[in-house]
Amino acid sequence: MDNDGALGFGAILRNDVFLAAALSLFMAQFAKALIVLLTRRKAGIKEIFSTLLWKTGGMPSSHAALVISITTSIAFSSGMASDVFALSFFFALVVIRDAMGVRRAAGMQAKALNTLGLRLSKRIHIPFKPVKEIHGHTFPQVVVGSLMGFFIAMAVNTL
C-alpha cells in the first residue's frame, strides 16, 4: 500500500464505479421507500426502514439500477472495448433477466401456492405454512431502475 491509501478505504471512496453503484443502489431503495410511504396510508416506520434496507421487488428496480450504474461507470473508466466492460455488460443482462423473469415467475408461483394452501387448510383443516413470496420486477420497474443507474453513473463519472 502506498502513502495515498491506494489499497485503503479512502481509495474506494475515490472509485467512480463504487460511488455510482452505491449511490444508485441507495437512491433506488430510497425511491422505493418513498413510494411505499406515499401510497400506503398506514406504512409504519418499520416497513419504511425495511424497504430502505433490503426489500426486493417494486418500483424502481434496485437490481437494474445497480448493475447498469456499474456497467456505465466501467465504460467510462475502462472503455467499452475492455474485457471488464464485456463482463459487466453480460452480468447486467443476467441480473436484469433474473429479476424480471425467474424471480418474478417464482414469486407468482409462490403466491398461487399460498392461495391454494390456505384454501385447502380452511376446507379440510390441514396445517399450512405459507412459503416466502419473492418479488421480482415488471418491465417498467426495470426500465426506471436502469435509467436511474445510467444517469447516476453519468453524473458521478462526468462531474
PLM regions with names:
Residues 15-33:
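N-terminal signal-anchor transmembrane alpha helix
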Residues 1-12:
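Short, strongly hydrophobic alpha-helical membrane anchors
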Residues 26, 47-159:
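Membrane-embedded catalytic cores of phosphoryl/pyrophosphoryl-handling enzymes
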Residues 30-48:
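Membrane-interface helix-loop junction between the first two transmembrane segments
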